[in-house]
UniProtKB/Swiss-Prot annotation:
Biased amino acid composition, Basic and acidic residues: 365-379, 406-421
Function: Component of the large ribosomal subunit. The ribosome is a large ribonucleoprotein complex responsible for the synthesis of proteins in the cell.
Subcellular location: Cytoplasm
Organism: Rattus norvegicus (Rat)
Protein's name in the database: Large ribosomal subunit protein uL4
The family this protein is said to belong to: Belongs to the universal ribosomal protein uL4 family.
InterPro entries membership: Ribos_uL4_C_dom, Ribosomal_uL4, Ribosomal_uL4_dom_sf, Ribosomal_uL4_euk/arc_CS, Ribosomal_uL4_euk/arch
Post-translational modification: Citrullinated by PADI4.
Positions of crosslink type Glycyl lysine isopeptide (Lys-Gly) (interchain with G-Cter in SUMO2): K239, K327
GO annotation (BP), single: positive regulation of axonogenesis
Residues modified to N-acetylalanine: A2
Pfam families: Ribos_L4_asso_C, Ribosomal_L4
Amino acid sequence: MACARPLISVYSEKGESSGKNVTLPAVFKAPIRPDIVNFVHTNLRKNNRQPYAVSELAGHQTSAESWGTGRAVARIPRVRGGGTHRSGQGAFGNMCRGGRMFAPTKTWRRWHRRVNTTQKRYAICSALAASALPALVMSKGHCVEEVPELPLVVEDKVESYKKTKEAVQLLKKLKAWNDIKKVYASQRMRAGKGKMRNRRRIQRRGPCIIYNEDNGIIKAFRNIPGITLLNVSKLNILKLAPGGHVGRFCIWTESAFRKLDELYGTWRKAASLKSNYNLPMHKMMNTDLSRILKSPEIQRALRAPRKKIHRRVLKKNPLKNLRIMLKLNPYAKTMRRNTILRQARNHKLRVKKLEAAAAALAAKSEKIVPEKGAGDKKPAVGKKGKKPVDAKKLKKPAGKKVVTKKPAEKKPTTEEKKSAA
């Protein structure tokens, strides 16, 4: 299948190229805006709604009055009387059985929406441009794999068809009948209450036939399921983009296809059949951004890239980070080394003192002579059977005498002083 070309071939009723070519209208190059199409479709579809409302008397066709407080029941109005289940039941409220609904619907709701004319035309232009792209048409679910060309244009002789069998034969010759078979396969019963409201069966959408003059073409195609017929002068966004999604499969007659430039104009000429209307333009004529940025015109205007790298300095604590301290104060390394040596030297002196004290204590214990014989020698113990103190636990040198505290003298009381006197 061929893609969009500047010249479009016109196909005959036999499904072959007739040899005639038509220039591609400018509307098929318009910007495709799915957001605008969806917005316009949503608002225009609201204009087909029928106003509805509930009765103003619904839920209030009874006499009920609140019982007030003091009865340990809710203060909702209750039906009067007795002798029936209804008496004493709640009424009027939206939470009550048989009561009115919350905010009863009114017929004066704002049902319709106004859409700008230019915006509606923009949506139609986008839908037409999308119908010429095979990828978008296939993404919508249309079976156009065997269709010879998009957009598909046929001769004006088709507009004079009056029999459905002629229309079916044309669709089969154009390889568009697969899309109709898809519609037949999709026919099914509607889910929900629409079955009760004369909307029992649903089906998918098929091709959209766009013609210029009705010489019987409507009668020929209207009985084929899924087919939509549109006059080129009365294009409808609800038909060109069902559901608000672009990509409808369209089949054009030659005269309708040629009329598009007069209806929507080109970028050099305004539309002749519409007053003061210009075709919307692209914001970017070339969407290849990398090609634009690498073009010599833009590269000449750009300055050379800055290759110097500026790194943020991370502030570190020199009291915890030796490398940063040495960077600030190189003498800190010498001070640190001297401190370590001094601590090692002091440790050696402390160990020597403890060893000397232990040796002196051992010599003193050997000089003590026991009263009994040498055989009855007992191990030297401290006072009250305590173990001898280790040399390491001694805090004072052995040369000094241990000062013992004298017991404090008891002072005489005042009574003792009086008796003594």
